[in-house]
Amino acid sequence: MSKRNYHSIFLIFGIMLFIAPHSFSQSKALSVGAVAPMFTAKASQAGNEFDFSLKKALTKGPVVLYFYPAAYTGGCDLEAHTFADLKDQFTAAGATIIGVSADDIQRLRSFSSNPEYCAGKFPVASDPEGEIAATYGLKLKPPQPGVKDVRGEQVTHGFIPRTTFVIDKNHKIVAVFSSETDHIAPDEHVKKSLAIVKGL
């Protein structure tokens, strides 16, 4: 799928998701300089389920923790595809990538292995109640009736605002990017994160 198509789907989904902003309260994400909350979560990489530990990942180097609304939706698909495309550069910088959404682990097993999206190159974790997101100051937005993913399936879970945290090996947040407040496209989260980890 071309990037033009990804952007078109993202725009349609964005309109659907944010057409009733009065029903959502904006999140106030943790700021640069804050200590990143540790967590362990069910995750999948290349279709294989495992327990992801942020603390363990940080022993290897910086971590790019990105929250996204839903697998198999335009903007999130573009973001995952871009992370997969640039994965070798993140690895060269010593960085780990972990995506987190409210999708259940079954959806993430498929999403993580799909060659159009994560392509098995990095893990995505399940936060169905938004508990991990809450520790980072992000509020889980309620499910929206009628929202379907790119496969035509109903999206029944809530949505975590698209927000990326770059965390250094000392557990400090060194960068935060939010589509809500910074108004940046999904693939820009990836490019900005890569620029940061290359400088650490």
List each language-model region with its residue ranges.
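Bacterial N-terminal signal peptides that target proteins for export
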Residues: 1-11
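Chalcogenol-based redox active-site neighborhoods
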Residues: 24-200
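Bacterial N-terminal signal peptides
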Residues: 9-21
